[in-house]
Amino acid sequence: MAEAARHPDDMKTPDELYRYLVDRVAGMESQNQELKEQIRQLESDKRYIETQKIRYEREVRKLKSEIEHLKTPPLIVGTITDIIDSGRVVVRSSAGPRFLVRVSQAVNPTTLKAGVRCTLNQQSLAIVEVLPSTYDSQVYGMELVDAPTETYEDIGGLEKQIMEIREAVELPMTRPDLFEKIGINPPKGVLLYGPPGTGKTLLAKAVAHETHAIFLHTVGSELVQKYIGEGARLVRELFDLAKEKAPSIVFIDEIDAIGASRTEAMTSGDREVQRTLMQLLAAMDGFEPRGDVKIIGATNRIDILDAALLRPGRFDRIIEIPLPDTEGRYSILKVHTRCMNLSEDVDLMEVARLTEGRNGAELNAICMEAGMFAIRKEHPQVDQEDFLTALNKFRCDFERDHRLTTAGVMFA
């Protein structure tokens, strides 16, 4: 190092000067390399800092935008009642009065329709946004998430009724060209009536399964609400949802809860039921006969239904679901026992003859009780004796026709 620090003038020989210069060049190259590494490190730090700066600037803009949104005054919710032209519409605000307002350029003119909800600016009442349609939570609850799995093979003894309901509901949805070729309008709705437990609901679910349609199931009593207009609104939203989800089937079970004959109402509750019925009649009149929405009603009391509900144009086809005869009961027993492990001595025809006046639900209960007796005896199969024992218990312990109970009653 001492030699390298000497001045070039002190060098006495060319060799010493050469070594001195070589050492100086090597030192300068090493120093140059270190400076290059420092420059690369500084450039890398600069790029990182610039990236962080861009990220923080973006975050600042996002927070400023959120603050501006929070400072924005709330909008008024209104309903479009009439469309004057693409830039002006008549709206009814949530407070009640109507206004002729302008439409923001950000709103798509094709979304402007009468009855659609929208948001209005507080100052100018201009339409800022068109809101999506919404329905009551009860209406959404009427839609079955899982499609019905029941098929026509699960129904026994109703071959004629199956044919009639397929003609009235299934064919218009799957083969509308047949009706167009003949030149007739298919039935708008089908009413199923008959004693309890004869398979009315099962038949409606089977139709929905075969047509691959959305199944909207409700009970008439669910449409009866406490406050004025609530029941009519539920009916209106139910049929609007059915049109939106088309092809769909609206099934109203126990329709006599809202469809009873109108009389001089003595209470506000009776008047509200009549308002709901009138909304139902208006909704049924609004359907296209060849549309993808069908309505099926079911009742045990057709004798008390209002005549306006039964007239052609609403429930065009009225199908009776009677108590099964011997052949029908035999078919029902075959359906209920197809998954049971039966012994060879089981005679379902004899069981069918012994169950005169029983409906499908009661026959299912008899099959279940026969299986329970086999389990009690720890038998691997259900024999004829189990069926006869179940039939005797069903007949003796619970007299359904007279509603009499005795000790050891069986509730099937």
Curated annotation (Swiss-Prot):
The keyword Endoplasmic reticulum appears for this protein: no
Subcellular location per the Swiss-Prot or TrEMBL entry: Cytoplasm
Coiled coil start-end: 18-72
Keywords attached to this entry: ATP-binding, Chaperone, Coiled coil, Cytoplasm, Nucleotide-binding, Proteasome
Chain residues that bind ATP: G197, T198, G199, K200, T201, L202, H336
Molecular functions per Gene Ontology: ATP binding; ATP hydrolysis activity
Primary residence: cytoplasm
SMART domains, A to Z: AAA
Biological processes annotated in GO: proteasomal protein catabolic process; protein unfolding
Segments of this protein annotated with the region Docks into pockets in the proteasome alpha-ring to cause gate opening: 410-412
Its job: ATPase which is responsible for recognizing, binding, unfolding and translocation of substrate proteins into the archaeal 20S proteasome core particle. Is essential for opening the gate of the 20S proteasome via an interaction with its C-terminus, thereby allowing substrate entry and access to the site of proteolysis. Thus, the C-termini of the proteasomal ATPase function like a 'key in a lock' to induce gate opening and therefore regulate proteolysis.
Family: Belongs to the AAA ATPase family.
Subunit comment: Homohexamer. The hexameric complex has a two-ring architecture resembling a top hat that caps the 20S proteasome core at one or both ends. Upon ATP-binding, the C-terminus of PAN interacts with the alpha-rings of the proteasome core by binding to the intersubunit pockets.
Domain comment as written in the entry: Consists of three main regions, an N-terminal coiled-coil domain that may assist in substrate recognition, an interdomain involved in PAN hexamerization, and a C-terminal ATPase domain of the AAA type.
Name used for this protein in its record: Proteasome-activating nucleotidase
